Each structure stands twice: as C-alpha cells, then as structure tokens.
Amino acid sequence: CLYLDYEAFGPLYASDIKRLKLIVGENTDAEKLTQFRKDYFFKRAMDKAIAAIKYSEKCEYDIRQKLQELCYDNEVIETTVEKLKKYKYVDDARYASVYVRSHINRKSRREITYALSAKKISDEWIEEAFEENPLPDEREIVMRLIQKKCPASELKDRRDKVIAYLLRKGYPYRLVATCVDDILRDETAVI
C-alpha cells in the first residue's frame, strides 16, 4: 500500500513502483499518480471484487471490507460496488435469501438475523428471505442439537450447560427447557 503524506493512496505492486519510478522520501508528480490511479485502480478493484465473489455469494458489506483491506480509497470502493450492483453481481436481497436457505436447519432465526444484520443487510430483506424460506419446526432442531451435544444418559448432569449452549444459539428459553425436560422424562421412563 502506498502512503502519501501519511494517507493511504492505494495498493501498488512492485512493477508499479518501477513504472512510476517512485523512491522513498522523494517528491512525486501528483498528476502522474492521479493518472495512474485512474488507469489502474478502478480495474484492479473490480478484478479483486469479482475474484472474491467468484466462488461464493457476497454481500455489499463483504466487498467493501475486502477492498478496504486492500487499501483502496472510498471513491474506488463506491464506484466498484455500484458497478457490481448494476451488473447484479452483488445483491443483498439475494445474499440474504441464500444465507437463510443454507443456515435455516442449523441456526435459530435470531442467530441468522443477527448475522445478516452484522453485514448491514436491511431488516426488510431479512424478512423477505424468511418468507421465501419458511422455518422448519424449531422444536425438532432443538431436540436434534440436544442429542448431538449430549447423550440422554448424561443430560441430567449437564442440563444447565446444554441449556446455556442453546440459549447462546438464539433459541427461546421456554422451548429449550421444554425439550430438555421432555428428553429427561423419556429417559427416566425407559429406566
């Protein structure tokens, strides 16, 4: 990353430094740098963004973060994101739908909503994604998670830990406690 007057100018490769004949501590022609920025930074930012979305769906927030990590300035980032949206490479509504569909059987609604909100996905798109992908029975999911986390024979001793685990996953206490108690009741009925 090249810094001019202690501010990030953008990412430069070794070949760019040779091409521009840059030397640490020496003054540089601002016009030459501005022209270089126009010629290369926008194309490189687009290439990096497309490489990021090549293998998996990304949201606008992910692309912005990736380009910021690579030291691109806000103008380059905004232009790149707008082009990606224009060509439908980035669509937060589609991202929300894909995310909900792929996580709905393993995570609670609350956990999915929190993850999408952290990526700056609008509440409207999150709700639409849940409408497109109806929630399975949460009780079944909680029962499966309890059985996966702890065998029924050990559940009595680890009850509080299992409940805390499921509460952290975003499931409501009443549902979790009912499921744990049902498993314990079934276990004692068998014995």
Locations of regions flagged by a protein language model:
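An alpha-helical, amphipathic repeat domain used for nucleic-acid recognition
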Residues: 1-191
